[in-house]
Amino acid sequence: MQKAKVIVIGGPTASGKTALSIELAKAINGEIVSADSMQIYKEMDIGTAKPGENEKQNIKHYMLDIISPEARYSVADYKKDAKKCIREIVEKGKIPIVIGGTGLYIDSLIYEIEYPELEVDLQYRKHLEDLMEKEGLEKLYEEAKKIDPTAMEKISQNDKKRILRVLEIYHQTGKTKIELEKESRKEPEFDYKMFAIDMNREILYERINKRVDIMVEKGLIEEVKNIYEKYEKLPTSLQALGYKEIVEYIEGKLTKEEAIEKIKLESRRYAKRQLTWFRKNKETIWLNGENPISENIHIILEEINK
């Protein structure tokens, strides 16, 4: 039996993935599944560049606003939920379009990675928490880099949850996260066609800077304050890029201007890491983000109809 086709569009932040995916969905009777680890959170709209109702243009979107900011959500959870959405779209006779910049989420689908359910070793977790308290998250980041440099290329030095996961996997299995994932790959359920957007670095960085300014104008600081004040314990989601820096401003560790500049800098660094990630997949078909959307849609249609 022929597998259902699924179009995947990756690429760095601010490269125009959303606009392209919506126009593509309109052209091919598609529906969109988000692969963005921050857009899954409710209440976090501005800093995650979540598409609003007008922007969606009546195209159904899945995997947006599915959990509250303090909830835990793993890559395994994403894979299970996203596949359910993809099946639903296929059953309707429509074409699923997976779109986002979270490489871990995309890889979980296209490589059908089975994530081992490891029990949390509370004693070891406490040891890591104590070490972090004493020497900072940077120390754990460096430790994780020594153990699993390949996995750490894709993980931000602020991403406490994933840094701990790399260390805990190695502690419990004696294998790196990458080794474990390679052993856990299966034949994918769908026929995924992977596309990614790239563009001139200067233009991309300019777009990132502009986007951050627009987010601040739209009320990013107020959005972060609301979440910060609402939850007793600081949610992990506020460790995310664009939120963490505003928390530092709220706590008086940075001025407003410093926080904004830091978001721009970290976003540019993140874009660089995203591009590195997508380049690792040799089957990725690259689209030029400076081209008109219609041109990129034409390329996508040619490829999926081969």
Where are these regions (language model features)?
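Phosphate/pyrophosphate-binding catalytic cores of soluble transferases and nucleic-acid-acting enzymes
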Residues: 1-306
